[in-house]
């Protein structure tokens, strides 16, 4: 696997593959990889001739009081895992390569409405940072296909919307959430949890399952959500949000809409966890 911080080297390697008519899949990450990331790489290898990955802890998507400095960096272990999974080219830029004029002078990409709610409301500017860096990475790598985990459901929808709105010739594929045996969605931030907190955190998925079951049985949506919030509180969570939305566009649920998604964000101690569950009522 080739590892480089240089945009030009990425483009030269991509050009070499393109001249042979070969296809490119791309998996952007922030590193500290787990099985969910590796699943994306392996799936990418099935869908294209070559797999490109990136590791970049993007400062633009972190708020002033968030965990940018504390975010785990495990580059050497990540490189081994990516190579073993089938990645052939790894882009590891520094912030001054991605934002040479600094973030304040950076042209940015913002997806309105869908990016202003849920996590966007809780973390102002977060999705502007995500959309900007993903758009830049897409322009550098110019893949045929890019893969993202469905655990970050709102992020996936924002990226799909951005690609459609900007007419980028890239297929965006969402891959199912990989979970631990307890049901807890795999996340780089799970490493912040103590053993006891990790056990408690499994209640997040259980609560979403209970909400889904209640709604399918005809329960009031508001009541199902209120019961779910109380279950989270009783299990030691501090809920940020727990909402039912239309799975197609994250709009509020109205009569006649059957493809739904439960979106959850809650704190276990100081660690903010997110998850979601799509279902048909």
From Swiss-Prot:
Catalyzes the condensation of pantoate with beta-alanine in an ATP-dependent reaction via a pantoyl-adenylate intermediate. GO terms for molecular function: ATP binding; pantoate-beta-alanine ligase activity. NCBIfam families: cyt_tran_rel, panC. (R)-pantoate binds at residues 61, 155. The reaction proceeds by a bi uni uni bi ping pong mechanism. GO terms for biological process: pantothenate biosynthetic process. It catalyses: (R)-pantoate + beta-alanine + ATP = (R)-pantothenate + AMP + diphosphate + H(+). The keyword Nuclease does not apply. It comes from Shewanella woodyi (strain ATCC 51908 / MS32). Pathway: Cofactor biosynthesis; (R)-pantothenate biosynthesis; (R)-pantothenate from (R)-pantoate and beta-alanine: step 1/1. It comes from the Bacteria. The active site is at 37 (proton donor). Belongs to the pantothenate synthetase family. It holds the Pfam family Pantoate_ligase. This is Pantothenate synthetase. Keywords: ATP-binding, Cytoplasm, Ligase, Nucleotide-binding, Pantothenate biosynthesis. Homodimer. It is an enzyme of class 6 (ligase). The keyword Nucleotide-binding applies. The gene is panC.
């Amino acid at each position: 696997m080739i590892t480089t911080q240089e945009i030009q080297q990425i483009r030269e390697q991509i050009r070499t593959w393109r001249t042979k008519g070969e296809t490119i899949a791309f998996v952007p990450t922030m590193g500290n990889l787990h099985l969910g990331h590796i699943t994306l790489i392996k799936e990418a290898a099935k869908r294209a001739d070559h797999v490109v990955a990136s590791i970049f802890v993007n400062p633009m998507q972190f708020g002033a009081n968030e965990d940018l400095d504390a975010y785990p960096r495990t580059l050497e272990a990540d490189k081994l895992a990516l190579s073993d999974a089938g990645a052939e080219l790894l882009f590891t830029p520094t912030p001054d390569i991605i934002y040479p004029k600094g973030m304040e002078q950076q042209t940015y990409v913002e997806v309105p409405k869908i990016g202003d709610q849920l996590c966007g409301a809780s973390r102002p500017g977060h999705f502007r940072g995500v959309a900007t860096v993903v758009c830049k990475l897409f322009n550098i790598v110019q893949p045929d296909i890019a893969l993202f985990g469905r655990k970050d459901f709102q992020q996936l929808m924002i990226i799909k919307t951005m690609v459609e709105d900007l007419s980028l010739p890239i297929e965006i594929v969402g891959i199912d959430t990989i979970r631990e045996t307890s049901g807890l969605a795999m996340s780089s931030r799970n490493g912040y949890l103590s053993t006891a907190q990790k056990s408690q955190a499994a209640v997040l998925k259980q609560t979403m399952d209970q909400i889904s079951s209640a709604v399918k049985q005809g329960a009031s949506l508001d009541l199902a959500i209120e019961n779910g919030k109380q279950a989270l509180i009783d299990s030691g969570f501090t809920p940020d949000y727990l909402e039912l939305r239309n799975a197609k566009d994250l709009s509020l649920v109205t009569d006649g809409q059957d493809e739904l998604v439960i979106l959850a964000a809650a704190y276990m101690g100081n660690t903010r966890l997110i998850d979601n569950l799509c279902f048909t009522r």
